[in-house]
């Protein structure tokens, strides 16, 4: 809870979400600058600090912003660190791909003020397009990676990483993941330091801060020396420890897998030695070697990639059981059952329960339940946009429909079927550039407003420059919807509850050189279809901005004012099924005999009334 995050009660125990605990750790560390681009499962860190910076104003002041993308967020934090201030940037795992360019260079430069990058990985891809393991970024960029094993450690290690960053002059990577970020646990609070936000004078350090080749050649050996020093620290750090046990079979458990391992051993009634690892890079070589050398067999438990397992195998000191020889799952996130099954298999015993049977039975039960696929919300303007796009595509006979990352990716589902390709943020525009030069078909790409600002502008400039012929529909719902309605530069709002200057998307588009630019409310289906037809006839890239606030925010505002007028299906309905079969708003219900509108779901967008060929849908009442 937010009140607990900002509570100045040292020693008190509270119940926090993992992401709230990370935010609290940053507060206890006396953070000066925070920057983020929202992305599940990291978003609540930024949201919590956005509220906290307002509530703590005058007691523990810091600057917080939602940045245009992850690269910008990382660079904002870099600037603060180089000025001697403590800074944190947070993002989901694929966001680090966007920030990778400055990440690798900043490793050479080094941190002055404490610098912490939080990457929230997503094993099992609950809300992501891949399952990448960002521990590899630490190895590739030669930066330390720390991985908490509990919500308490999430708070403690977030705070500790600032100290380590300043002690060793290194940017620190704190690796979270879905089951830590979105878990709740008891956290003992530390003290919130009292401080004012103060500006400082710039001090020049061109020999380290300007990574010319001549400087970089000198900086790399220094970076490697820093890594050696922090490895020595990790070898004796309290974040890693050995739980003594019986026998010559040991387990190395990484991060949250430690909790799964301890419960699995309890279920199996075993007392095996366990090395709990939270320093993922550089790995504590001496600590691992001392542990492994005492064992005949070592079971490695870690999520996503065999990162630690590869290292332990290379030592050649014991038989290793893990992902690479099929004892631990190579795919998806772990739980107690998966870990216990792997340990039992390595030991040649049976697990305490038939976990595979339990999973099979649960799948049978799930198959009997009514399907509940994710859908666009009632009144979502994206539904109206995709309906209009589908109308135009049906007139054409076919078209290529690249899309992007956001709520609107759900446009892939029937009956809208408005999404053919989704790769990454901004790729709808970039991919359309490529398709435009090789396809006979027309191309209609879709991208959200926040995603367009994040990564859609450079490929749009490329389309103008290289004369790529396609239509780009910017689905502008005036928020970053899928991650929790965070502000972006187009909204006029900023972090910490402050107002900002709204950047008009149509001005950006025209500034890129696009000649066909039209703004339309997608609830006006007839006009939306007309604009799309004209855009398709334009020679070159054409941009249609479909602007209507997110239905959730729009309906909340109108409910507060008592202005919602819902709609109902009248006796004039002929069961033509146009509304159900081609629009499919969740508020529309067909029970096998008649079509009706769920009054508790309807937000009064009136799109169903506009597309009904028999004018059988009318206003019902004011709520």
From Swiss-Prot:
Gene Ontology molecular function terms on file: 4 iron, 4 sulfur cluster binding; indolepyruvate ferredoxin oxidoreductase activity; metal ion binding; thiamine pyrophosphate binding
Residues binding [4Fe-4S] cluster 2: 585, 602, 605, 608
PROSITE patterns in the record: 4FE4S_FER_1, 4FE4S_FER_2
Keywords: 4Fe-4S, Electron transport, Iron, Iron-sulfur, Metal-binding, Oxidoreductase, Transport
Record-listed E.C. numbers: 1.2.7.8
Residue ranges crossing the lipid bilayer per the database entry: none
GO terms classed as biological process: organic acid metabolic process; sulfur compound biosynthetic process
Top EC category: oxidoreductase
Cofactor dependency: [4Fe-4S] cluster
Pfam families given in the database record: Fer4 (PF00037), POR_N (PF01855), TPP_enzyme_C (PF02775)
The keyword Iron appears for this protein: yes
Entry function: Catalyzes the ferredoxin-dependent oxidative decarboxylation of arylpyruvates.
Official protein name in the record: Indolepyruvate oxidoreductase subunit IorA
């Amino acid at each position: 809870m937010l009140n607990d995050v900002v509570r100045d009660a040292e020693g008190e125990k509270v119940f926090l979400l993992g992401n709230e605990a990370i935010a609290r750790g940053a507060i206890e560390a006396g953070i000066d600058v925070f920057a983020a681009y929202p992305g599940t499962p990291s978003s609540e860190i930024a949201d919590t600090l956005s509220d906290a910076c307002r509530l703590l104003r005058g007691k523990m002041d810091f600057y917080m912003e939602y940045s245009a993308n992850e690269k910008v967020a990382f660079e904002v934090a870099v600037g603060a660190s180089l000025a001697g201030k403590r800074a944190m940037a947070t993002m989901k795992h694929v966001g680090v791909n966007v920030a990778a360019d400055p990440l690798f260079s900043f490793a050479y430069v080094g941190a002055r003020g404490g610098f912490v990058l939080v990457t929230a990985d997503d094993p099992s891809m609950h809300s992501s397009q891949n399952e990448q393991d960002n521990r590899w970024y630490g190895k590739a960029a030669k930066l330390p990676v720390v991985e908490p094993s509990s919500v308490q450690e999430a708070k403690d290690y977030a705070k500790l990483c600032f100290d380590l960053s300043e002690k060793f002059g290194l940017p620190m990577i704190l690796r979270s993941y879905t089951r830590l970020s979105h878990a709740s646990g008891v956290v003992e609070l530390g003290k919130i330091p009292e401080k004012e936000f103060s500006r400082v004078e710039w001090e020049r350090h061109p020999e380290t801060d300007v990574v010319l080749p001549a400087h970089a050649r000198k900086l790399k050996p220094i970076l490697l020396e820093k890594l050696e020093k922090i490895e020595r620290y990790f070898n004796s750090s309290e974040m890693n420890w050995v739980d003594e046990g019986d026998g010559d079979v040991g387990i190395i458990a990484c991060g949250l897998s430690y909790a799964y391992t301890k419960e699995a051993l309890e279920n199996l009634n075993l007392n095996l030695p366990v090395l709990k690892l939270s320093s993922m890079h550089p790995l504590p070589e001496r600590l691992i070697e001392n542990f492994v050398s005492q064992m005949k067999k070592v079971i490695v438990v870690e999520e996503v990639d065999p990162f630690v397992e590869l290292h332990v195998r290379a030592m050649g000191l014991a038989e290793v059981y893990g992902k690479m020889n099929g004892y631990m799952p190579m795919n998806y996130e772990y739980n107690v059952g998966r870990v216990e099954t792997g340990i039992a298999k390595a030991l040649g015993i049976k697990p305490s329960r038939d976990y595979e049977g339990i999973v099979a039975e649960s799948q049978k039960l799930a198959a009997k339940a009514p399907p509940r696929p994710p859908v666009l919300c009632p009144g979502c303007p994206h539904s109206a946009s995709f309906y209009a796009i589908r109308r135009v595509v049906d007139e054409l006979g076919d078209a290529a429909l690249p899309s992007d990352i956001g709520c609107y990716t759900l446009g892939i589902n029937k009956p809208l079927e408005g999404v053919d390709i989704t790769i990454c943020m901004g790729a709808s525009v970039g991919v359309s550039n490529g398709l435009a030069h090789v396809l006979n078909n027309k191309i209609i790409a879709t991208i959200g407003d926040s995603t367009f600002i994040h990564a859609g502008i450079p490929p749009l400039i490329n389309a103008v420059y290289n004369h790529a012929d396609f239509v780009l529909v910017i689905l502008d719902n005036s928020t970053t919807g899928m991650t929790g309605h965070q502000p972006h530069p187009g909204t006029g709002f900023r972090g910490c509850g402050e107002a900002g200057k709204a950047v008009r998307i149509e001005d950006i588009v025209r500034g890129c050189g696009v000649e066909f630019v039209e703004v339309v409310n997608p609830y006006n289906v007839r006009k939306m279809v007309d604009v799309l037809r004209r855009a398709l006839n334009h020679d070159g890239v054409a941009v249609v901005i479909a602007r209507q606030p997110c239905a959730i925010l729009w309906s909340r505002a109108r409910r507060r004012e008592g202005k919602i007028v819902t709609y109902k299906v009248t006796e004039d309905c002929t069961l033509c099924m146009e509304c159900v079969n081609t629009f499919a708003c969740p508020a529309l219900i067909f029970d096998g005999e008649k079509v009706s509108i769920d009054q508790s779901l309807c937000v009064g967008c009136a799109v169903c009334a506009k597309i009904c060929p028999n004018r059988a849908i009318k206003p019902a009442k004011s709520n």
